[in-house]
Amino acid sequence: MAPKKKGKKGKGKGTPIVDGLAPEDMSKEQVEEHIGRIREELDREREERNYFQLERDKIHTFWEITRRQLEEKKAELRNKDREMEEAEERHQVEIKVYKQKVKHLLYEHQSSLTEMKAEGTVVMKLAQKEHRAQEGTLRRDMRALKVELKEQELANEVMVKNLRLKHTEEITKMRNDFERQVREIEAKYDKKMKMLRDELDLRRKTEIHEVEERKNGQITTLMQRHEEAFTDIKNYYNDITLNNLALINSLKEQMEDMGKKEEHLEKEMTEVAMQNRRLADPLQKAREEMSDMQKKLGSYERDKQILVCTKARLKVTEKELKSLRWEHEVLEQRFIKVQQERDDLYHKFTSAILEVQQKAGFRNLVLERKVQALVAAVEKKEVQFNEVLAASNLDPAALTLVSRKLEDVLESKNSAIKDLQYELARVCKAHNDLLRTYEAKLLAFGVPLDNVGFKPLDTAVIGQTLGQGPAGLVGTPT
């Protein structure tokens, strides 16, 4: 479009050339066509002029608006400059105030730290003093118990020796008594056996003598009868001549009588033999009874010996039972005394543990609250400081300087917090070591930890591991 405008300006200077021809050389149609093109260009130029006028009006309007906005922004910038100057003044004042507060906080923190250290030192000294006193008391009690135990052992040994001597004397005396009784019983039963044997022999001899006398009497009677019969027979033979038939009859009668007498005598002899056998049977029975009596006497001797041994063992057992009962009573009294001492130690230990736990718990609670308060205050101050920095839009160099100072203050606060945590860990460690020491003492005195009645509290800060270091070292917080 720019060359066409140059062509329009060249019309007034010379004859325009259209399509390589002068207007004079153009035909009517070409001229009309050329005029149509010129009109189209004129319409297009008018449209472009209208468009550029609209653009110019818009640009002018935009320029006016921008100029007014620029003036407004300049006014706002001047206001902001004034506000920044005022904010800078306020910020300087707040920084001075914060510095003063930080100084006060540092002073208060240092004072509280000094007080807590002094307090912890005093408490530790008191606890150590109490611990030493209790340890001395326990050692004295242990020495007294050992001395008493040694005395009781010596007394028991002397008593056992005396009891053994007495027991030996009693056993010897009892043995002599039993031997004497055995000898007396043996002599008594030997005498009884001898008397029984003599009595049985006398009875046997008497019965035999009676039988012999009776048999001798019977034999004498028979001999007398035989003599009488012989005399009668002799008289008969002397008188046979007088009456042979009567004699024969009488002889027959006599022979029959003699046969009867002989049968009677044979029967009597059989009865005497049977009576002898009957007398021999009681003698045999007496002999068997005597052997049975001897066997019974032997079993009686064995039973008597067993009875003697049983009585001796019974007496020994009764003496041992009396001794054991006496020892049981002595041990029971010692047990009651040791139990009372254990109860006293248990009450002392319980009161000491509770007191130490209360002191340590209170001290730990105070330290934790102080640490939490300091951490919360530091976090609050940091948030406020960040808000002030964000609102003040300070120079980067000044911001860096202030940030460095704040970091120094925070670092000092963190170091103070670590010192407090370390001090808290040392106190917890001392408390736990004291608990371990008391538990060891209880085990040394034979008191089970389950009989204490409560579980000692191992102090530790929540979420941290304090006071757990090897070989008495204090663990730092993690």
From Swiss-Prot:
Annotated keywords: Cell projection, Cilium, Coiled coil, Cytoplasm, Cytoskeleton, Flagellum, Golgi apparatus, Microtubule
Composition bias, kind Basic residues: at what positions?
Answer: 1-12
- Name the UniProt record assigns to this protein: Dynein regulatory complex subunit 4
An example molecular function term from Gene Ontology annotations: microtubule binding
User: Which source organism does the UniProt entry give?
Assistant: Bos taurus
> What does the UniProt entry say about where the protein is found?
Cytoplasm; Cytoplasm, Cytoskeleton; Cell projection, Cilium, Flagellum; Cytoplasm, Cytoskeleton, Cilium axoneme
Q: Where does the protein principally reside?
A: cytoplasm
Coiled-coil residues: 27-201, 246-427
Annotated spans, Microtubule-binding: 115-258
- UniProt function note: Component of the nexin-dynein regulatory complex (N-DRC), a key regulator of ciliary/flagellar motility which maintains the alignment and integrity of the distal axoneme and regulates microtubule sliding in motile axonemes. Plays an important role in the assembly of the N-DRC linker. Plays dual roles at both the primary (or non-motile) cilia to regulate hedgehog signaling and in motile cilia to coordinate cilia movement. Required for proper motile cilia functioning.
The UniProt gene name for this protein comes to: GAS8
Would the keyword Flavoprotein turn up in this protein's UniProt record?
A: no
